[in-house]
């Protein structure tokens, strides 16, 4: 109910709740919503869970993967059986160029992680909650990146004027 679909391919036994799906596909036995947005060129495979306030753009999300809430996945390739925690963002745009993120099968992405593309997360890797990941993480490894805040005076203005 209350969903908008345009040029969408929807599999069997799919539940879509109050969501928007445009030029994308959702595989068999998957659930989407409420309040999710699947933008152009997104493929959600079979047995996936896309939860509330989740947005995908130009991405692949493999069989059995879950992304339950408050997340942005853009220009990304996610494998099978991946868990994406609340508040995860794939940071795909640096203000001038877009880059891709790749996450391999079985990875666990902790809540409030930022994946700064281009970056690759290995099979069965774990990203600790609250991490900003700027380097690739190998198979089976854990990435943790939490730093103390620092202020760079005037940098915002300098960056915008480049």
Locations of regions flagged by a protein language model:
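Core alpha-helical transmembrane segments of integral membrane proteins
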Residues: 1-2
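Glycine-rich hexapeptide-repeat left-handed beta-helix
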Residues: 7-9, 16-162
């Amino acid at each position: 109910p209350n969903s908008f679909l345009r040029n969408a391919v929807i599999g069997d036994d799919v539940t879509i709740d109050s969501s928007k799906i445009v030029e994308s596909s959702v595989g068999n036995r998957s659930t989407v919503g409420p309040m999710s947005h699947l933008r152009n060129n997104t493929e959600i495979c079979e047995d996936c869970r896309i939860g509330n306030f989740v947005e995908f753009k130009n991405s692949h999300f493999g069989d059995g993967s879950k992304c339950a809430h408050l997340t942005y996945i853009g220009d990304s390739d996610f494998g099978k059986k991946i868990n994406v925690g609340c508040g995860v963002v794939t940071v795909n745009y640096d203000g001038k160029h877009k880059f891709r993120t790749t996450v391999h099968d079985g990875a666990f992405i902790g809540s409030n992680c930022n994946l700064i593309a281009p970056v690759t997360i290995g099979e069965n890797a774990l990203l600790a909650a609250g991490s900003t990941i700027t380097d690739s993480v190998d198979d089976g490894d854990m990435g943790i990146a939490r730093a103390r805040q620092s202020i760079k005076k005037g940098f915002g203005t300098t960056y915008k004027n480049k």
